Amino acid sequence: MIDQKAQDNFFKNHWRSNIHLFKHSGANLVKVINNLKPKFVIDAGCAINFFKGKIPNLVGYDPVFKKADIMCGHFDAPFKPECADVIIALGSVNWGDSDDVAHMLIKIKSWLKPGGRLYMRGAPGGYKSDKGLQWFLWGMKEINYFARLMDFDLEWVEIEHNTTGSDGGTLPDRFWPHRYVWCYKRKLIK
């Protein structure tokens, strides 16, 4: 069970965005997504809405940050089935156990058109300041498991190492020196 109060507290009081430092899930992802020329993009758990204005036709939702276009969580988001060409979930499917992750992915997949892409980022652990949070421990085994379970094609996986900029960010506070970034593709209906 995900403790929403602990999660909200962590994001409001401890977490700071470091997306500008990320090689595979920061500005470079903008180019990758824009090259697909998507008609509709959902940023699931958009936090500070970093991609807004950089990726056309993007709507971001988040339960904590007011910069979101819609303030809600995964299960309250108002999207219709198979409406999105691309979904970005960079750290928003990192909570709870395997069943919790499966439920979140089922919901997110329901919005993705056949042939659409889901860009994800997950870590094999959390922060020193994340009291009360249950992190899902992502690794290659888990990434492949959910590809099979959700009937996704796994297009690519990259390892993104934690670096720090002049602002320091929260990366020095992480237990693990890296995270995974990957792309699932929803299979076409035959």
Model-flagged regions — what are they?
Residues 1-78, 117-190:
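Class I (Rossmann-like) S-adenosyl-L-methionine-dependent methyltransferase catalytic domain
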Residues 75-87:
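A short acidic, Gly/Pro-enriched loop at the edge of an enzyme's catalytic core
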Residues 86-99:
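A short SAM/SAH-binding and catalytic strip from SAM-dependent methyltransferases
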Residues 98-102, 137:
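Non-membrane alpha-helical structural segments and their capping/turn regions in soluble enzymes
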Residues 102-114:
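A short glycine-rich, Lys/Arg-flanked "PGG" loop and its adjoining helix->strand segment in the class I
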